[in-house]
Amino acid sequence: FRYLITIENQSNEIIQLVKRHWNIMESTKPTQIFEGPGVVGKKSIIKTGQMVQYESGCIINSQRGAMKGFYTMINHSTAKEFNLEIPVFQLDNLFSLN
């Protein structure tokens, strides 16, 4: 499955993506957890009003699944980390629904 995530910085601060955390759920396995630095090899710095997109993918063995997680960001002004939640989204094999 491929997915596209868009982040828009609507704050007045410069932020940077530093880590990712994903929960990948499918019907045939326990939830898989993936964590690591950056996203697709990038630790993007996002200025006020700027938008970035990440395209990636995951392999699951079932026809349907779901993902949720968060990106850990850092505020460049305060050096404080915060989590940017990514709500659950479905992974559906459209061909199996026909």
Predicted feature locations:
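Short, solvent-exposed loop/turn segments enriched in Ser/Thr/Gly
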Residues: 1-3, 68
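Asparagine-centered strand-capping/turn motif at beta-strand->loop junctions
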Residues: 6-12, 75
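Short acidic, flexible loop segments centered on an aromatic residue
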Residues: 12-33
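Residue-level recognition of conserved beta-strand positions in structured domain cores
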Residues: 19, 35-36, 56, 69, ...
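Extended, polar beta-sheet/loop recognition surfaces of beta-rich domains
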Residues: 21, 39-42, 82, 87-88
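Short, surface-exposed linear segments at secondary-structure transitions and domain or protein termini
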Residues: 26-29, 41-51, 91-98
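Intrinsically disordered, low-complexity Pro/Gly/Ser/Thr-rich segments with frequent PxxP/GP/PP motifs
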Residues: 32-64
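Terminal connector regions
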Residues: 59-98
